[in-house]
Amino acid sequence: MTDPALIDELKTLVEPGKVLTDADSLNAYGKDWTKHFAPAPSAIVFPKSIEQVQAIVRWANAHKVALVPSGGRTGLSAAAVAANGEVVVSFDYMNQILEFNEMDRTAVCQPGVVTAQLQQFAEDKGLYYPVDFASAGSSQIGGNIGTNAGGIKVIRYGMTRNWVAGMKVVTGKGDLLELNKDLIKNATGYDLRQLFIGAEGTLGFVVEATMRLERQPTNLTALVLGTPDFDSIMPVLHAFQDKLDLTAFEFFSDKALAKVLGRGDVPAPFETDCPFYALLEFEATTEERAEQALATFEHCVEQGWVLDGVMSQSEQQLQNLWKLREYISETISHWTPYKNDISVTVGKVPAFLKEIDAIVGEHYPDFEIVWFGHIGDGNLHLNILKPDAMDKDEFFGKCATVNKWVFETVQKYNGSISAEHGVGMTKRDYLEYSRSPAEIEYMKAVKAVFDPNGIMNPGKIFAA
């Protein structure tokens, strides 16, 4: 869509200066963190109200113009990429927390509220927003809802879906729907709210969301444990889960740790070299809980599941231990990683990881593989690092070949090709490995109801 007359008409729907067509803006707002697709939007529009969003959607319907939602653009599946002349709808100016309800522990947010902004707001109120991940400083609530974002606390607090009390959406027809009205109990038929969570903007745009908040955790304490092999991580998880209510249980490989330590600004947890590491967190609200954690650690050492470990003794040490895990994605970005975000049920994780690791190692022995993830909920992040001497297109082509084998294994284990990053365009052609043909047809039928003209983020989840 490059018709200047249509762009001029679009400009009348928003405030002056809130439609951009310069090359820098098109490049910046037409992409997310994926590097697989060249951005090529026609324009970027910045609404400041629900009414303006409705007007934009109705304009797009009238002229059959495709729209792509844009939040913090931190996604890893190209769900926010505009590569085919679409108009990008950025929610940067709809960024306010509109209301706080102390009794209900809820905050009413516009879609452009940054995740860390909501976290800080909750903290200022003596509360806690628990959905957390490395991109919290720039990701936006609308995007979190669009991908049903997970992160590092899912084992205790669940996904974004669990924290949406209600929301307002503008459908692909331009209708405004208020979903669930912030109720805890609402047994009145279909919960349409759940359809829009994880829909990646393909049904409509979230324009307001009421987010639930939680009590603040107290005296959070972390342990980093080194294990002799991956199989040992699972009994460690079970041992600690039997004794403590964990708030997190993460894992990473020795190669992941080496990359982070290579930065020079993060201390090693201990001197012993181990092939795999687990990071777990719990609330040490009493001295007995801390003692129980130490006793469980000693038990794991006696069983041969743990070679070495350390437990945080201060807030600073807690932060340093978390940096070992949280800095991985940022650190390996230098190597243009090809990322897979896959999941199986927790009990299948060891056999699944071994099989995937063997597949990649057999076919591409020269590729460096970095594993990490949220082992407590069965979510593994497989990262294949690009050799410095290899062209990016050649590298991505080889990785795409690996994908088929990886996803066939995911299907074999009844897993998901996308645990928390969404489908977007990067996983679109592999959806059949996680969803049956009947499911996909019903999903397309749902989209047709809310977006009959196919203007809402077309080409994401399934082909346009």
Swiss-Prot record:
Induction: Expression is up-regulated by exogenously added D-2-hydroxyglutarate or D-malate.
Gene Ontology terms for molecular function: FAD binding; metal ion binding; oxidoreductase activity
Cofactor: FAD
EC number, as in UniProt: 1.1.99.39, 1.1.99.-
Entries under Gene3D superfamilies matching the protein: 3.30.465.10, 3.30.70.2190, 3.30.70.2740, Vanillyl-alcohol Oxidase, Chain A, domain 4
Keywords: FAD, Flavoprotein, Metal-binding, Oxidoreductase, Zinc
Disruption outcome: The deletion mutant is barely able to use D-2-HG for growth and displays a relatively slower growth in a medium containing glucose. Cells lacking this gene also show high accumulation of extracellular and intracellular D-2-HG. Moreover, the mutant strain loses the ability to utilize D-malate for growth.
Binding site for (R)-malate: 325, 329, 339, 421
Pfam families attached to this UniProt entry: FAD-oxidase_C, FAD_binding_4
InterPro entries: FAD-bd_oxidored_4_C, FAD-bd_PCMH, FAD-bd_PCMH-like_sf, FAD-bd_PCMH_sub2, FAD-linked_Oxase-like_C, FAD-oxidored/transferase_4, Oxid_FAD_bind_N, Vanillyl_alc_oxidase_C-sub2
Cofactor binding summary note: Binds 1 FAD per subunit.
Binding site for Zn(2+): 374, 381, 420
Regulation: Activated by Zn(2+) ions at low concentrations (10 uM) and inhibited by Zn(2+), Fe(2+) and Ni(2+) at high concentrations (10 mM).
One of the GO BP terms on file: respiratory electron transport chain
Domain FAD-binding PCMH-type: 37-216
Residues holding (R)-2-hydroxyglutarate: 325, 329, 339, 383, 421
Catalytic activity: (R)-2-hydroxyglutarate + A = 2-oxoglutarate + AH2; (R)-malate + A = oxaloacetate + AH2
Oligomer and partners: Homodimer.
UniProt record similarity statement: Belongs to the FAD-binding oxidoreductase/transferase type 4 family.
The protein, known as: D-2-hydroxyglutarate dehydrogenase
Organism field: Stutzerimonas stutzeri (strain A1501) (Pseudomonas stutzeri)
